[in-house]
């Protein structure tokens, strides 16, 4: 469950390490974002010579949350951290690698690239 001001780890090799959510997209007064939701973020910590710089405002998709996601069979998948993957204007990942597991809930038309790059799909 991500809201405005939430800090997230970055799960790709775009050059950003930590980002902060500045807006949850999808609805005029939407408060929370879960796994698979798109948010606006600002880069708070980045590595030198990366594709993105500190202070850049980007779009991101949430791939892991501490809150987790409930499956139809009743099982709950949750993680130790909140993490996101940075996206460009075409909703394609900025990085070329994804670190850590992602969930099957991302398996939609627009996020198949993230699923194919991920080392593990839960």
Curated annotation (Swiss-Prot):
Matches recorded under InterPro entries: Ribosomal_uL14, Ribosomal_uL14_bac-type, Ribosomal_uL14_CS, Ribosomal_uL14_sf
GO cellular component, one term: cytosolic large ribosomal subunit
GO BP terms in the entry: translation
GO molecular function: large ribosomal subunit rRNA binding; structural constituent of ribosome
Keywords: Ribonucleoprotein, Ribosomal protein, RNA-binding, rRNA-binding
SMART domains named in the record: Ribosomal_L14 (SM01374)
Gene3D superfamilies: Ribosomal protein L14 (2.40.150.20)
CDD domains for the chain: Ribosomal_uL14
Role played: Binds to 23S rRNA. Forms part of two intersubunit bridges in the 70S ribosome.
Protein family (similarity comment): Belongs to the universal ribosomal protein uL14 family.
Assembly mode: Part of the 50S ribosomal subunit. Forms a cluster with proteins L3 and L19. In the 70S ribosome, L14 and L19 interact and together make contacts with the 16S rRNA in bridges B5 and B8.
Matches recorded under HAMAP family: Ribosomal_uL14
Name of the protein this chain belongs to: Large ribosomal subunit protein uL14
Species of the source: Alcanivorax borkumensis (strain ATCC 700651 / DSM 11573 / NCIMB 13689 / SK2)
Gene for this chain: rplN
